[in-house]
Amino acid sequence: MAKIAIIATDGFEEAELIYPYYRLKEAGHKSVVISLGKRPIEGKFGYIIKPTFKIDDVSAKDYDGVIVPGGTKNPDYLRRNKDVLDFVHTIDQQNKLVGAICHAGWVLISSKVIRKRKATSYYAIKDDMINAGANFEDSSVVVDGNLIFKNFFRILCQTYSFNC
């Protein structure tokens, strides 16, 4: 049973958080929502979620992977938080699963984990990914070792299996 952190804050894309959260649970894994604080967070379309933990109360060593959902505001806020960046960077350094959906590539850019690695993203941040040194592929899904990128939430159902 894997323990996967889903890191999000206000402005998350609901489908990109809710689908992996429940799909992991259905497969027998433990999924938790980690945020910048303990207050409820509001998604892009108004869905409210109460985080399980706040980022400064967790350690990457206790998790088997991390997923960062997109939306435009969510990753923009997350990439400004040192604890989030350290968490994602440490998970990557431990060769554990790092999933980024849509605009979440911004968090991986700021975590310094995509240079010289294959990646994809929502088309609007393609230049950001390339300028950060990613080997960008215009594809729905890109896997490079422990990194899994999805360019848009609509393809989640097709490929987020996490070896379940």
Language-model features: where?
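Extended, subdomain-level signal for the structured scaffold at the beginning of enzyme domains
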Residues: 1-94, 98, 107-113, 126-138, ...
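Anionic-ligand binding patches
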Residues: 119
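Short, thiol/selenol-centered motifs that function as redox-active sites or metal-ligating centers
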Residues: 101-103
